[in-house]
Regions:
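Nucleotide/phosphate-binding sheet-loop regions of phosphoryl- and nucleotidyl-transfer enzymes
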Residues: 1-309
Length: 310
């Protein structure tokens, strides 16, 4: 029987850390508990090991399983990958058994291209959000998958803000962000020598390869050596349907703990930003608000978070 390399969150559980990695096992456990987790799937640590055995290639069997599970995600979400009617956008994250610095950063909004961004801009009536997602995706993919430094894109953002006489990214308009997306693609082409990928499957396989590659980057190797983590473990990959924190001031992103990390006290702790996406909280671009303020700004969401945390 063929090896199973991919698991829906609903197919796993919290005891499967060796196979699904820490993040994948916990997402599966939260799904089993009925928590409101955006659905997706985990590509196993065994797929990572196989990738290295195959000369750093994702073989046809694993690719076929990944695309089979994209189809299952499409059934769950009612959206389709690369579709021009109701497109599915995903995030891609690494997830080793043990938390490790130096592993691949997150890629958000994967599945966007020139055509799809136009569709979501029109359908949502929110072109600023659509082009914000697109420019972020180009920036993340270029940095994380193709190793084009973040600084080149940050410089273009700073130039655009100076041109518009604003200081915050959130003050840039839909037109500004559309222009930036074009500049980002030109920057990508000048650095890589080819056009930014438009095929969602190509984007997805590129992102998954980048996660597997990051298992053996210099920082990860040094960390493993210092902490007696075997190189044979490999890392899992989590592909999850997007939840958007950057659709407006009634949306947000944040980090939360169900206990005080310093004392262990049973108290919800964390911070959040409105109209932002994941990396904004830790990037230091804007100052996050303490999670207690969420009770005033978004009482329903706060109550749901409080209930879930118990």
């Amino acid at each position: 029987m063929a090896t199973k390399f991919v698991y829906l969150f609903s197919e796993g559980n919290g005891k499967m850390r060796e196979l699904l990695g820490g993040k994948g096992a916990n997402l599966a456990e939260m799904t089993n508990l009925g928590m409101p987790v955006p659905q997706g799937f985990t590509i196993t640590t065994e797929a990572c090991t196989q990738y290295y055995e195959d000369g750093e290639q994702i073989n046809d069997e694993i690719q076929a399983q990944i695309m089979e599970y994209i189809s299952k995600m499409e059934e769950i979400t009612g959206k389709k990958f690369g579709d021009l009617e109701n497109p599915l956008l995903v995030s891609v994250r690494s997830g080793a058994r043990a938390s490790m610095p130096g592993m691949m950063d997150t890629i958000l909004n994967l599945g966007l291209n020139e055509d799809v961004v136009e569709v979501i801009a029109k359908k949502s009536g929110n072109p600023r959000w659509a082009y914000d997602c697109y420019r972020r995706f180009i920036q993340m993919y270029s940095d994380v998958v193709m190793e084009v430094g973040k600084k080149y894109f940050e410089e273009l953002i700073d130039q655009m803000k100076a041109k518009r006489g604003v200081t915050q990214d959130v003050e840039l308009t839909a037109e500004d962000l559309k222009e930036l997306a074009g500049q980002f693609k030109a920057e990508y082409k000048s650095k890589i020598g080819q056009d930014f990928p438009t095929d969602p499957k190509e984007q997805l396989m590129g992102a998954i390869k980048a996660v597997f590659r990051s298992w053996n980057n210099p920082r990860a190797i040094v960390y493993r050596r210092m902490n007696d983590i075997p190189g044979s473990w490999g890392t899992a990959v989590n592909v999850q349907s997007m939840a958007f924190g950057n659709m407006g001031d009634d949306c947000g992103t944040g980090v939360a703990f169900t206990r005080n990390p310093a004392t262990g006290e049973k108290k919800l702790m964390g911070e959040f930003l409105t109209n932002a996406q994941g990396e904004d909280v830790v990037a230091g671009v804007r100052t996050p608000m303490p999670i207690a303020e969420m009770a005033e700004k978004f009482p329903e969401a706060y109550d749901c978070l409080l209930y879930t945390s118990k």
